[in-house]
Amino acid sequence: MDQYIKKKLAKNWFKTLQEVLCREIEEKEGKKTKFKITNWNRSKSNDEGGGQYRILENGKIFDKVGVNFSEVYGKFSNEFKNKVPGTKTSSKFWASGISVVMHMKNPHVPAMHFNTRYIVTSFGWFGGGMDVTPCMKDKKLENWFHSELKKSCNKHNKNYYKKYKKWCDEYFYLPHRKESRGIGGIFFYYKKNNWEKDFSFVREVGISFKNISNEIIEKKNKLKWTIKDKEIQYKKRGRYVEFNLLHDRGTKFGLQTGGNVEAILMSLPPTAKW
């Protein structure tokens, strides 16, 4: 399959998923709370792509949720290109993806994160994953979440779940705190074996996130919470901020490739405490 077609298929999927997720989130919130939509361009003078980020705040269910789509292209800086595969002969790149972060009003509902992307240099690969960060311990929820992820992974390859769970546990870890960010999930990168199969898996991950996040909200949002619970949530969000600013690859990639700063930092919660 031609790389142009692969790019178009991947980009269209990410954009469609953004539309679907935002529509469902607004339906949950009701008529009063809507996404604020911002379009952006990577360059003011050259055609280097851009994207659209959507942020909804102060809802009855969501304190803040961001859903970002991007398609950017151009050249890596000499400093950054050495960190990216496929750039020995050329610094040109193309990248598209979707990123979602949900910070909930009810402290019993965990923060949820998902992203998938397709990056092309001299060759193309997929990356992404999803994870959940509760501020209240709930072993039943944790077991259910991982069983759902395993089911999704097993549809494509029986080895995926164990491997991608391990990568997620290793990735979402704060070494300076010596603690994990949350209860894990799956995380994968440099996926470039069979394009059709890889793209099918990437779509599966997106659909799974939609279904899992809906189910978690349905289960947990009914629970009553206190001011003390909210304070616990604020402190847990502090850990979220630390990880995203110090260790997150997506944040570093976006900032070092001229991405939109507001879109990149949309993952940060509206309020956090230390």
What are these regions (language model features)?
Residues 78-80, 109-111, 138-141, 253-255:
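Short helix/loop capping segments that flank catalytic or ligand/cofactor-binding pockets
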Residues 6, 104-106, 122, 132-139, ...:
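A generic structural motif
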